[in-house]
Amino acid sequence: MAKSLADLRVCIFDVFGTVVDWRGSLIQDLPGLGKKYGMDTDWTSFADDWRGLYQPQMHRVRKGELPWTNIDELHKEAFEMLLTKRGLKHPGEEGAWEFTHLWHKLRPWPDSNEGIGNDVRFEELIEIQHSQGVRRNQGMKAEVVR
């Protein structure tokens, strides 16, 4: 623990796309969950389309067309939009959240933990994003800094 602010060594980082392989994680996990709910589609393009809705939704929030909305709600809304667009049956509320929470299970790139672990300057590593398997002391969500 740092004894003074001058000694504090903290690294706060966003993991999305840089530290975690969001695309590979979703492409790997979506087919199994789809099978569980009797859904079949091109899951690779589904993952790309799902991610592609992020910026347009954030733009709506920034413009005030949507109130401040946490990322889970935005991901769920985008998921449901894609179901309609692709003519897929809705897996129910619980199922929709199960799909949405795949964004919490993004796996790191093979060299991520080694790279983070080699930086000994930092006593605290704080990740801004949900992920699975990233070396860190704490996780931080947007709600903390809202």
Identify the function of each model-found stretch.
Residues 5-110:
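N-terminal helical cap/lid subdomain that shapes the substrate entry/recognition surface
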Residues 94-106, 112-146:
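Substrate-recognition element of Asp-dependent hydrolases with the DxDx(T/V) motif
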